[in-house]
Amino acid sequence: MRQLRILGIVGSPHVKGLTSELVAEALGGAASLGPGTETVSLAEQGIIHCDDDHSECWSDGVCRRSEAATALSRKLDEFDAVVLGAPVYYLDVNGLTKNFMDTTRTLNTNGKPALGISLAGGTGKGLTSTLRSIYNFFFCIELRGIDPLPVSRFNYKKALSQAYSSGRKLAELCKRRQPFESLSERIAYYHGLKYLNYDIVDENLLLAQQLIQNIEASGDAKALLEEAIREYSEAKELVGQGKKTEAVVHIMNSYEAGTKAWDIQNH
C-alpha cells in the first residue's frame, strides 16, 4: 500500500522562524499517524511573480517563467494533503507566499485536505484577513481547507498544540479524499469555515480575546487585565446586538489594556 504524504510549505523569508515551527508542528502531528512528510521553504525556491502572459499554463500546469513554480505545483498534485503557513505583511500574505499562489497551476488537487496558518507578529493585526487569502487560494485550486489557524504572539504556545492536532486530522482525512462535486458545494463548504467571514472589527475582537485568555497577571498587570476584561465584555455585548461601530472603541480599549498587561508580564 502506498504511503500517504503531506507537504508543508513555509512562506516566511526566515527558513527556521516561527512560521516554520508552526508548520513543523502540524507535520509532526500528521507523521504521528504514519504519513510521510516533506517541507518546502519558499525562501529557497526563487519563485518570481506571474506576468499573466502564457494562458496555456492553466491547461498544462507549466509555468513558463519559473521551473520552481512548476515543480511545486507538481508536488501539490502528487501529495495527499498540504499545510501552508504564511506571515502577515500589511494585513495579508507576504510577497513570497503571493508569488507562490499566483504561479501555482495544479491538475490534481480537488478535495485534498489542506491546513492554513497565518502568523501575525507585533500587534497581531491581519491574522484573520491573511487566513482569508490563504483559504481563498485553497478554494481556487479546489483543496478542502480545514481548521483555519490564526496565530499571534499572544496565542502562539496554544497554537503549536492546535497545529499538531490539526496535523493529525489531516492525516486521517487524506485517507479518504473528498472531491467537490460542484462549485456550489465548494462555496457552501468554505462559507462555513471559521474566521473566513471576519471583518476588521471581528479580527480585533479576536485579538482582545487572545490577550485575555493568555495572560496570568499579578501586580500592576492584574488591574490592566481586569480593565481589558471589562472592555471586552462591553464590546462583545455590542457586537452581539449588531452594533459593531459602537463596539470598536471598547475593543481597542480592551486590546490596549491587554497589551500593556502582556508586556508587563513578559518583560
Enumerate the predicted regions with their spans.
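N-terminal beta1-alpha1-beta2 submodule of the flavodoxin-like/Rossmannoid cofactor-binding fold
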Residues: 1-101, 164, 170-171, 175, ...
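Phosphate/oxyanion-binding loops and surfaces in catalytic or ligand/nucleic-acid-binding neighborhoods
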Residues: 107, 141, 173
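Short, glycine-/small-residue-rich phosphate/pyrophosphate-handling segment
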Residues: 110-162
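Short helix-terminating capping/connector loops at secondary-structure junctions
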Residues: 1, 109-110
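A mobile, often basic/glycine-rich helix-loop segment
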Residues: 102-106
